[in-house]
């Protein structure tokens, strides 16, 4: 089967870099940097679509649903990267934000031949995690045509879930198959077709906003503090103390005592201090407010 790449912006040559192999290193890097500066501007054009996606994800979380990223190659790895950071940062289970990649775990470290061309595999990978109508799927593919991702999106639509897409070529099959389509038009890559570069950077920026925005909307952030952070290493133990001190304007000893009484749960310690409650009382109040600290202290 012949694939026509001529209409894909991500596959065209970039006039700014046609002689990049002849440039001194500093000039070469300057060209790359100048092109990278276009990425955030391209993503800024998508804020209305990203808003819709964030609100859909937050609503799914409220119903016990999950956020599932799916992609092949770099796109799949970026989804896994974003998903893997959610449990330590926001204290959610590893099942709440899931990243799937064509070819499975082996494909995280090395290419798996032909995996991205299997549409049925994409659907099967969703079936394997019991993907359902309460979940949200985000299909990621710079080209906008990856069969593995399209197969997953078709299955997600069939079960009644909200389907989003992140791509970099306007009018692609991926964009057309989504309820919410986020198309970051970043232009041709510095190295023709190397969509791990500008396209990958755009995907990462959007993924950052999707997960962060949904976590903020569901009470995982107080002010700009990650109040559900888990103390899984020495740095994060210290961060917890600083968060409690910042959130309550208390002394270090007060924060340490509250955290000890709260079994090292930041939110509980903060509510204890702000509302003058015991640990059990703070937990009860947090539960009744769906985890929103701001609703516990008024």
Swiss-Prot record:
Pathway where it operates: Amino-sugar metabolism; 1,6-anhydro-N-acetylmuramate degradation; Amino-sugar metabolism; N-acetylmuramate degradation; Cell wall biogenesis; peptidoglycan recycling
Keywords annotated in UniProt: Carbohydrate metabolism, Lyase
GO molecular function: carbohydrate derivative binding; carbon-oxygen lyase activity; ether hydrolase activity
Top-level taxon in the UniProt lineage: Bacteria
Pfam families in UniProt: GKRP_SIS_N (PF22645)
Disulfide bonds: none
Residues at the active site: 85 (proton donor), 116
GO biological process, one term: peptidoglycan turnover
Protein name according to UniProt: N-acetylmuramic acid 6-phosphate etherase
Organism, scientific name: Aeromonas hydrophila subsp. hydrophila (strain ATCC 7966 / DSM 30187 / BCRC 13018 / CCUG 14551 / JCM 1027 / KCTC 2358 / NCIMB 9240 / NCTC 8049)
Gene that encodes it: murQ
């Amino acid at each position: 089967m012949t694939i026509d790449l001529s209409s894909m912006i991500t596959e065209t040559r970039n006039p700014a870099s046609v002689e990049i192999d002849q440039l001194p290193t500093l000039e070469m890097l300057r060209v790359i940097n100048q092109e990278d500066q276009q990425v955030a501007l391209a993503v800024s054009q998508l804020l209305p679509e990203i808003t819709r996606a964030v609100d859909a994800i937050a609503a799914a979380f409220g119903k016990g649903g999950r956020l599932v990223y799916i992609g092949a190659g770099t796109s799949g790895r970026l989804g896994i990267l974003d998903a893997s950071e959610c449990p330590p940062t926001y204290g959610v289970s590893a099942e709440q934000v899931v990243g799937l990649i064509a070819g499975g775990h082996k494909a995280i470290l090395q290419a798996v031949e032909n995996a991205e061309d299997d549409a049925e595999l994409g659907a099967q990978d969703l079936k394997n995690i019991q993907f359902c109508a309460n979940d949200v799927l985000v299909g990621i593919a710079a080209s906008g045509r990856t069969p593995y991702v399209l197969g997953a999106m078709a299955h997600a639509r069939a079960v009644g879930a909200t389907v989003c897409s992140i791509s970099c070529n306007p009018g692609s099959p991926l964009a057309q198959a989504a309820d919410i389509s986020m198309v970051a038009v970043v232009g041709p890559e510095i190295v023709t077709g190397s969509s791990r570069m500008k396209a990958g950077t755009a995907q990462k920026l959007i993924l950052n906003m999707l997960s962060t925005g949904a976590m903020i909307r569901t009470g995982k952030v107080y002010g700009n503090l990650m109040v559900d952070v888990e103390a899984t290493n020495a740095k994060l133990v210290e961060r917890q103390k600083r968060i409690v001190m910042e959130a309550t304007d208390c002394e270090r000893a007060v924060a340490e005592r509250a955290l000890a009484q709260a079994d090292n749960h930041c939110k509980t310690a903060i509510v204890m201090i702000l509302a003058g409650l015991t640990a059990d009382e703070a937990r009860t109040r947090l539960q009744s407010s769906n985890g929103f600290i701001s609703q516990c202290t008024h």
